[in-house]
Amino acid sequence: MITPRHRERWLSPAQDKLVRTFRANLDEDLHVQGYAGIGKSHLLGTLMECLRPGGALLLAHTSGKLEALRKRIGDVHGSKAGLTFIEFAQLLLNDPKPKPVNELPKFLSKRALSQELNIIGVRDYDTQSTLNICLKVLKNYCRSRDYTLSTKHLPYFNQPLSSMDARVVLEYSSQLWGYLESNPAWYGLVELDALLMIKRASLSGCVVPARYSHVLIDESQDLPASLMQIIERGRQVLITLGDEYQQAGGAFVSRGRGVRRSEIAYSVRSGRNVESLVNPLIYRHSSKGKTPFEGASNTDIAVKYYPQGFLPPEGCVVLAASRWDMMKWIIQMDAAGRALIPSTEAQKDLKRFMATAIALFKPDFYSVEQIPDGPHLDFSEFSSWQQVCDANRYDESFLWVEAELEKGFNVADMNQLKGMLGQSGNSCMVMMAEQAGGMEFDVVLLTPQLLTVNKFRDVNEFDQRICAVYIAISRAKFKLYVPYDVAEWIAHHDSQKFREFSGY
């Protein structure tokens, strides 16, 4: 089609129909549910060309996703079109950008924060573990529309807190919220900078500036309810493009009943062979939409089944089930003389995860309190290695890592891993499948743990894994390595019961 700016845009029939409907109804809200590879970013650029210059506010979750989006949509309203969620919140609050962690005074640490708030621990959790629990409470609160903290913001505990302990955690969390509000320089250190800024803007009653007529959000499955609350206060038309199957954990923020909806299932990136892998996942999920995924007939992604012991080729992106799985693959690849490197954003996080695991396994040699920035949030509910074992006893990658720790793997070994040193050459990248949404890579490998044959806890855990596998499969542009057929994997789990029943 030729856009109002006299530019030629090549569109699929489904995209063309949606754009024509949009142009005829510019004052109507719209939500597009589009599977991976349907060209959502390209479509978004076309929609923006139908609006007056400067009238569209484009939002994306992270700077990485915004940069990728800018490259895909082209020069629609300038090369710097759009804002990240945190940049938008800063604009509304008229706040300067919080200082990066490496620019903060050196005396700032989570230990110092715990002491400042006089957090002394809850139940058998030490000071730093209790602080991490409070941070999880604040994360849940910041994502919500709620105005006050309550027990519904508590994270899941394998052993539920007593009512007294729950009140103590909420009181600590309330104190932490008040302290962070007065000291925004801490935002980056506690790793909640974007959500804290958005929640502050929401609680302050902020609205989208009136100069914007439309708000467009890419990857809207990342949209927190608190940000939706801000947008809904204004009079702008809201256009969201997302994929519910790329929201593995947490709730997908739904739009109101009066919102025009459109589904696009035809993928311009993936072929029929990927279609045969993705549709069994869609059909098996217990609650999400069942519109079949349709691969392009003129596109072909090579799907390869790899044997046990296979090493991914140079430049491949390994998508793992968990941080335990990432740790396992990094150690295995290092033993083979290869570097498996976490993404830049994940490297510090994974190193902290590994250091915390080692410290809990060897408390006579290491202390979690000596870890810079404190123990990893994944361990906030554990005060001993036995508790870690109990929570992960069905995770094969965890059992493999535990065996390595029993053989003597320590912090010095961790620091010498090629993947943690950032060595390049014949290296590959590793990341968690759930965190790869919205990205695309030339060559992708799914780990065996991602397609585990062990029983899942319940239907909810299986649903979450189905979404993670969907994300992983749909990231590949040219070649995809899988350990076995996805339809057979689904059939295997259909033939066995879950470990537990969900619900009442």
What are the roles of these predicted feature ranges?
Residues M1-Y504:
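The feature marks helicase ATPase cores and/or their adjacent C-terminal helical subdomains
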